[in-house]
Amino acid sequence: EVLFIDIKNTPIYWIGMFKKLIQNNHIFTSQIVGFFDKINPEIDIENLKGMGDRVSYERAYYYLSKIDITDKMHQDSISLNIDKQLLKALEQSILFFQEYEEYEKCAFIKKILDFTKTL
């Protein structure tokens, strides 16, 4: 019997996607800016960058929000993924959401960041 695991529904995947989206945010944003700048050179680039950042951080948070810090499997997944990039992504996300006064998101991310410091 073959067992299939839907990797997209695992905490290790969610943490990896969170980290990847934050790390690659600047690439995504510059691609959006480049695309729209070709269509309309008079477009407000700073506003467009802000929208690109918003899309990236919101999508990254979508994945991170699936983490249940009280679940042992989720804790183990964080332990397996912990590195400088994850810590930086968590810190950057807190700063980003503070700018928009989304303190519930900041508090959730801070719980995960605090958990990483216990490892």
Stretch-by-stretch model annotation:
Residues 1-98, 108-119:
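Long, low-complexity, acidic Ser/Pro- and Gly-enriched intrinsically disordered regions
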